[in-house]
Amino acid sequence: LSKKTTGAFTLPGESGYEALTLELAERWGADVIRDSDGTQLSDEIINAGYGIYSTICIIRDHNEWASQNSDKLQQSFLITNPKVAVQDYLSIYLMEDFFAEQFRVNDSKEAFKYWQVFDRTTGEEVPRELWNYERESGNVVITGIAPWHKYTVSFMVYRIWEEISMYNHTTNHWEKEHLMQIDPIYVETQKYLLHWIEDWCHKHKETTVVRFTSLFYNFAWIWGSDERNRHLFSDWGSYDFTVSSRALDLFAKKYGYSLTAEDFVNGGKYRVSHIPAQQRKLDYMAFINDFVIEFGKQLIDIVHKHDKLAYVFYDDSWVGMEPYNDRFEEFGFDGMIKCVFSGYEARLCSGVKVDTHEIRLHPYLFPVGLGGLPTFMEGGNPTLDAKKYWINIRRALLREPIDRIGLGGYLHLVEPYPDFCDYIEKIAGEFREIKELHHKGKPYQIKTKVAILHAWGKLRSWTLSGHFHETYMHDLIHINEALSGLPIEVQFIDFEDIRQGVLQECDVVINAGSAGSAWSGGEYWSDHKCVDLLTAWVYEGGTFIGVNQPSALEGYDSFFRMAHVLGLDEDTGSKVAHGRWTFEARDEQDLVPEGASITPKNNIYLTDGSAAVLCEKSGMITLSAHAFGKGKGIYLPSFTLSFENTRLLLNVIRYAGNELKDTKYITDNLYTECAYYPESKILVVINNSDQLQKTTIDTEYGQQTLELDPFDTIIRTIGD
């Protein structure tokens, strides 16, 4: 790497550790110092000549006001576990399954009208006259009911401990007041917050950037009473924690119909992001989004009036913000900050329409990491953690620009880890070099353009619902992560986009997920027009790549609606007496690299024998291709992220786009990758592995052969 560079780095400062803060600010090339949850900045740090980010969580840290206005706390619907009646009455203790420090029953008149009791055996609501709430005991008693039927109660609760603070508190064994969260849906809360932020800006003249962490509503995170199942429900994309009787009343007024508890709790399944949303949920999301923009803009305008920038953290209480909604720019944010473990999260940040894109690296400077494993404590290896996260992120940074990087947490924890400090210095310099390359021009991409088709489309570009470790069970997150660092143009589309003609911009459409999921598409595949348009598009030369149960929907002659294009289908039990086409697997195009591993699915069968099976395992298809007109259908029964499988995906996409023979700017060693920036004539080569690697790259200036140390990056000029 070349001479030392500075800037584009946000350092978490810490009062009481001024010398360390200022020393690392210089070493890591920081231009900004921030505070974090649990830390402050002293005058010495504030006056040291750096930009200052100040973190505000707009809906918490207001305990005095919250205590005086406890009916303005944020809320949620909860549903009890189903109980079987053994006689004609049943008593259900509402809070039996839930963490008492997180929730308090809201039995106010406004909330109570939204409570529901259901007979889950019949699926019918129990009439109001058959149940009664006993406030003192916290029980709902149901009478005159059918023995041996199952019953649930859906009720409203106040959330009395803000979830991110609750997590940080329990993780770090803090002993301080539990922070509550207030709901800006109430006019009184809005007045209080507008006055509060005005006052805050007056008192923090040194702050250059107000870091909103985040806006109003947290993703749903319901904790249980039993440590054997502490996290009952967690969904990063869920709107469950935006609910209140006032929001529901205002919704009914605006949309002309009322939502019920059942619209949210869905018999205990909730309305998870992984299932296609019904129109009622989409209406409610739009309603909340409208409100969050309308009130959020007022707060941001005040920040701007005080000549400060407003950045927002794209995590935690981000719900209702929707950066991939066409209206996001109405907020007026100057910057977006995303915490990242993975490449797809860096791409999620870089694609947002905002002036400054910043990623917060991991590990976070806490003793333990998100999974509860030691980080900055005995048994931890923060340097190795940082390397693993950096190699995930680096490949994505080569494809699309990010403007800034940074860290968060307790800076003093890094003192016993000089190798960690050295490594952050190295990657900060690396990042600044990559950033400069993007300024000069875009990196080379292959010609084949890819679209990912699912029920959410653009709104959930790159992500599914949270971090990789929260969504690893879905094939698509593995595909997104693989794509995040490949030299391919990627967009995310939904079924309406197909109707509007988006296929004209695509060479390959990937549909990956289990039947009924938002990622496969579920009921959207009943739209014959979309099936027709996709079929015609493949016939004219496009490629449909299906993974797991693509286009799956019961009720038709085939389980996969695109079976005629794929040349295969899945037997769900109705073809048990039918004969099967035999096959011989031949990978004539050499698509499958050594070490690639695709887990097969039972009951996948060829429809008419015309599809070519390229790879199989134990007699089950693991990769197939089917010519259809000028195009093709390609099938993979699963996809799991690995270096080998990432190269397999790249090969399959190049094959789909008839680019297999063009190997320009693709490394011959799959443990390495490269990016070429034509305007700068700069080639960046990265080693993703923990071993020394030798790699050769075809360029327009001849072959380049390099040796790379474990995890290393080489940046070199080629050509003139």
Give the label of every model feature segment.
Residues 6-13, 30-36, 171-191, 275-293, ...:
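The substrate-binding groove and active-site-proximal loops of carbohydrate-active enzymes
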Residues 10-53, 196-213, 392-402, 482, ...:
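Catalytic domains of carbohydrate-active enzymes, especially glycoside hydrolases
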Residues 28, 45, 62-66, 197-198, ...:
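Hydrophobic targeting/anchoring helices
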Residues 70-331, 348, 440:
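Polysaccharide-binding and catalytic clefts of secreted carbohydrate-active enzymes
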Residues 221-224, 231-234, 412-444, 566-571, ...:
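Extracellular ligand-binding/catalytic regions of CAZymes and related secreted enzymes
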Residues 469-492:
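Short helix-loop-beta junction
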Residues 521-601:
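A glycine-rich, often tryptophan-bearing local segment used as a flexible ligand/cofactor-contacting loop or short
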Residues 605-620:
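Short, Gly/Ser/Thr-enriched beta-strand-loop segments that form substrate-interacting elements
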